[in-house]
C-alpha cells in the first residue's frame, strides 16, 4: 500500500515574523473558529501581521489576528479581531509557558493553513533578532 500524502493548502504566512524574530521552535496547533470565519479564511481574508499569542489560564489565545467578515454572513459574523483559542496539548502549553517565563521568548503565529480540511496554525517560539546596523 502506498502512503497517502497529507494535503495542505496555505492560507496566510507571517513573513515579517521570520524577519523580525529568530525562530527557536515551531509548533502546529488547531484553532477554534465559527463557521463564517472559516468561510472567510477559504477566501484568504486574514492578516497575521500584528498578531501574537498569550498563555492565559493554561490556554493559548491568539490576539490581534484580523479575519475579515464573511460577505454573506450577516448576523453570524463576529468581531474581526476577537481573541481566538488555540488547541494544543496541555503538556505543550506548559512547556511553552515555561520558556516564555524563564527565557523571555515570544509566541508568534508564523502561518495559517488547511490540513485535511481543518484550519491549523504554525506557532513559533521566538527571540527578537538584533538590529544589524
What are these regions (language model features)?
Residues 41, 46-114:
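Extended, positively charged loop/linker patches that create polyanion-binding surfaces
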Residues 1-34:
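Intrinsically disordered, Lys/Arg-rich N-terminal extensions and targeting peptides
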Residues 19, 34-37, 89-92:
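Helical mechanochemical/support elements of P-loop NTPase systems and associated helical scaffolds
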Residues 131-132:
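Conserved small/polar residues in nucleotide/adenosyl-binding loops
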Residues 119-127:
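A short beta-strand motif that forms the metal-chelation/ATP-contact edge
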Amino acid at each position: 500500500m502506498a502512503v497517502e500524502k497529507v494535503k495542505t493548502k496555505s492560507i496566510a504566512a507571517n513573513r515579517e515574523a521570520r524577519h523580525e524574530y529568530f525562530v527557536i521552535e515551531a509548533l502546529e496547533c488547531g484553532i477554534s473558529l465559527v463557521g463564517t470565519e472559516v468561510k472567510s479564511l477559504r477566501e484568504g481574508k486574514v492578516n497575521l501581521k500584528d498578531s501574537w499569542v498569550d498563555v492565559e489560564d493554561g490556554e493559548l489565545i491568539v490576539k490581534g489576528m484580523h479575519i475579515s467578515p464573511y460577505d454573506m454572513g450577516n448576523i453570524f459574523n463576529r468581531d474581526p479581531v476577537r481573541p481566538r483559542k488555540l488547541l494544543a496539548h496541555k503538556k505543550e502549553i506548559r512547556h511553552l509557558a515555561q520558556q516564555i517565563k524563564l527565557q523571555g521568548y515570544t509566541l508568534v503565529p508564523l502561518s495559517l493553513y488547511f490540513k485535511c480540511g481543518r484550519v491549523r496554525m504554525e506557532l513559533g517560539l521566538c527571540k527578537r533578532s538584533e538590529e544589524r546596523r
